[in-house]
């Protein structure tokens, strides 16, 4: 184990009542389990290599190749023993050229569901070390996934074995079943390591990063997770919630007793695609929306991250090409006195538009006005994403234009929210292409 068991137990306050260790090898971890108070009879070992399994003298050794289904497979035995797998070697041959297959054995796999049920195994700690087949083993747990509090598993970030699951796939599968990756130790050059997944309790506390647009992403993602899994957990939120007077949704205030999610940005449009009606119901407005026949050019300088010198007049000149005719035009900015706001104002006026800068208002009022404005033009921010989505879901004729450029920061945001799978409720404008 690359991560010492004692550190896992201490960090996450786990009390072991039993262990299921899949990929026993020489049972090297036995002393560590005993040191944590687990009785020898409550430790179960599964080993696919029959020659190794025969040499093990501990109780509860089960000779079996584990997978997600019962099927005949070829078990590849390597010269070092530890790299043997039901999957063929792939990049492993590059990373560890000294390791090679010396023999093969035809085997019928078993599922962990069958193994646990037939032997009456009671364990809350699962250790997987089966060379790329870890996700297959997890999928074969069936309902017994619910008896585990911790999953310690080998993980891969490159395809060391043909068809092996990579780390993001394990994250996704376990997260949807209430487990969160809390610690990872990797041999980066080799593409493999170990990870610890801990079951969360029924109260999740979002330690949010970002601003309100990203908060909406995080809260919506958690609520969709709650709906999809049927788990009755409560979402707490430690940030000040700025939309309480506008939206009916109000998350509970954060609490230290809740399981804390310290995650990256939820900024992937694909997780909401096809679930728009659920989003509309979740983030319902307190008062009926009324469309306003106006155009708002949104300039939040924080989204441009001081790249205004690189953007120069290219941004406002692109905006001018997409302004509607015969509609009042306003610039909205949290920093109305910023020189770049005045540069944009001047460019738009020179193009013949009567445009003004709106006075600064509360965030709630600005958000509501952006949603209700018929036309909104803005940068690739999370705020504009939600303005466009919620506006389109509630008001017919809502038009949101999102301006993209390599000179804008957070290129990953432009991809996950916009260009990878363009949202139906936004028109994308590529400044770099002269659009």
Give the ranges of each region predicted by the language model:
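Phosphate/nucleotide-binding beta-alpha loop and adjacent structural elements of enzyme active sites
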Residues: 1-202
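A short acidic, amphipathic alpha-helical/loop segment
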Residues: 8, 32-36, 55, 136-144, ...
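Residues at the starts of beta-strands that form the adenosine-phosphate
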Residues: 18, 42, 232, 328, ...
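Short internal beta-strands
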Residues: 45-47, 148-156, 234-238, 329-335, ...
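Short, aromatic/basic amphipathic alpha-helical patches
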Residues: 56-58, 165-174, 242-254, 338-351, ...
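Secretory-pathway luminal glycosyltransferase catalytic domains
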Residues: 205, 233-327, 336-338, 420, ...
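A short, glycine/small-residue-rich beta-strand->loop->alpha-helix junction that serves as a flexible
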Residues: 208-217, 306-309
């Amino acid at each position: 184990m690359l991560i010492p068991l004692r550190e896992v137990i201490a960090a996450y306050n786990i009390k072991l009542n039993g262990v299921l260790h899949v990929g026993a090898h020489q049972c090297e971890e036995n002393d560590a389990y005993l040191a944590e108070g687990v009785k020898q009879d409550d430790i179960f070992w599964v080993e696919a290599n029959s020659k190794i399994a025969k040499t093990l003298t501990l109780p509860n050794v089960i000779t079996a190749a584990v997978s997600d289904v019962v099927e005949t497979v070829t078990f590849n035995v390597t010269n070092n023993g530890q790299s043997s797998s039901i999957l063929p070697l792939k990049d492993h041959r590059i990373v560890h050229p000294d390791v090679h297959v010396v023999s093969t054995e035809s085997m019928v796999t078993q599922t962990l569901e069958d193994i646990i049920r037939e032997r009456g195994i009671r364990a809350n700690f699962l250790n997987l070390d089966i060379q790329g087949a870890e996700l297959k083993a997890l999928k074969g747990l069936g309902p017994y996934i619910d008896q585990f509090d911790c999953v310690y598993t080998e993980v891969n970030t490159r395809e060391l074995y043909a068809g092996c699951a990579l780390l993001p796939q394990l994250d996704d599968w376990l997260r949807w079943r209430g487990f969160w990756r809390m610690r990872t130790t990797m041999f980066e050059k080799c593409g493999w390591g170990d990870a610890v997944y801990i079951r969360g309790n029924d109260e999740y506390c979002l330690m949010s990063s970002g601003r309100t647009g990203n908060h909406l992403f995080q809260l919506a993602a958690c609520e969709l997770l709650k709906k999809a899994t049927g788990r009755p957990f409560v979402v707490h939120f430690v940030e000040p919630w700025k939309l309480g007077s506008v939206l009916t949704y109000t998350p509970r205030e954060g609490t230290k007793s809740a399981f804390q999610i310290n995650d990256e940005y939820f900024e992937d449009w694909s997780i909401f695609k096809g679930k728009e009606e659920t989003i509309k119901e979740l983030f319902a407005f307190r008062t009926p929306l009324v469309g306003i026949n106006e155009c708002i050019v949104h300039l939040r300088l924080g989204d441009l991250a001081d790249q205004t010198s690189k953007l120069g007049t290219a941004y406002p000149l692109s905006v001018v090409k997409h302004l509607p005719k015969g509609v009042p035009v306003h610039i909205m900015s949290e920093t109305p006195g910023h020189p770049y706001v005045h540069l944009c104002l001047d460019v738009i006026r020179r193009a013949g538009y009567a445009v003004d800068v709106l006075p600064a208002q509360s965030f709630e009022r600005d958000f509501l006005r952006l949603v209700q404005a018929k036309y909104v033009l803005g940068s690739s921010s999370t705020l504009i994403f939600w303005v466009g989505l919620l506006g389109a879901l509630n008001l017919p004729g809502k038009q949101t234009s999102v301006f993209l450029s390599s000179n804008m920061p957070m290129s990953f945001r432009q991809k996950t929210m916009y260009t990878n799978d363009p949202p139906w409720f936004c028109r994308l404008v590529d400044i770099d292409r002269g659009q």
